[in-house]
Amino acid sequence: MTETTASQVRPVLSPWLQDQLTQLLARRGHAWLLQGPSGLGQYTLGLELARAWLCEAPTQQGACYQCRSCHAVDVRTQADLRTLMPEALALELNWPLDEKTQKDLDDKKRKPSKEIRVEAARDMVAFSQQTRSGGATKVVFIYPAERMNHVTANTLLKTLEEPPGECRFVLASEAAHQLLPTIRSRCQNHTMTWPTESQALRWLQTQGLPLADAAVLLRAAGGRPEDALDLANAGLKAAHWAVLPKAVMRGDVGAVSDATPTQAIATLQKICHDLLALRMGAEPRFFMGADLPTAGTTVSLTQWSKDLMDAARTCEHPYNAGLMFEALVARAQTALRAKE
């Protein structure tokens, strides 16, 4: 099999990501922080930037997708690329873990971490000091960067500021405000570009969504196309989304019980947000106005919003998910039925 046939054909990036990749490749800098809310493509852009830096025949638009380096990135064996991710996310995205970590997980000594562990950061420091395997540079890709705790982040500081030899960094974050200021100050910042609605809808259609469904789910995701696609892949139907607010007001627990507790709370927060927006004379963001009940008071909705934020902090390990859904919907009804 030839090198070319073994490699992927260059994928078509969404236009808003391709424009950003071209801009970043034209600029200098050994460390970039890609920041913005979820659903705008930080992971995709970060990986494409790393791939292009490592490519043997890059263009102004990015990597060639034909060389040995590009193929090695595809199959997760590029020796000059090190990814720092929470173990749970690395497994989900098919990135290999180090031998000891994998053995610990296989032996069920512990569960995959949801944070970037300090041991991984120490391994990265050692990686940065190693000789390159053959390319022009080495690359460290950290995602989501906000999953580093203070100990992990502090382990990176000196290497991030003064990397030994040719080593470049790309940090991608969906909550950059949670990063240590010292981490942010050592990076050049790039704020992710929001696509236009028409760009996002066209992209969602290329992913297989009918236009009508794409429009509803894009709204449900607050205009973030990758989040909209995640909602579709999770099984959310446009028709179900439209009837959710009034179903919750009726006390229909089944309207949210198919979701995880985290997802259910996020949905209720969107209902609460839009109802508060209407109370303030603004346009709703996540639902059509006709799909929202005329319900609640400014005081009751504000308190409900605070209660939902409290619930979000403790929802990952409910004693009984069914009882939690019932409590969430009952609390919603209390807020929605309040009178002036």
Model-derived features: positions:
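Charged, glycine-rich active-site and insertion segments that engage polyanionic ligands
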Residues: 1-52, 60-61, 68-69, 165-168, ...
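Short N-terminal helix/helix-N-cap motif within the alpha/beta-hydrolase-1
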Residues: 150-153, 337
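Conserved catalytic/switch belt of AAA+ P-loop NTPases
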Residues: 129, 154-168
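Residues immediately C-terminal
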Residues: 147-148, 162, 178
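Loop/turn-to-beta-strand initiation segments
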Residues: 134-139, 164-170
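Conserved adenine-binding aromatic site and its adjacent loop/helix in ATP-hydrolyzing domains
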Residues: 126, 158, 185
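Clamp-loader machinery-focused feature within the broader ASCE/P-loop NTPase space
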Residues: 2-151
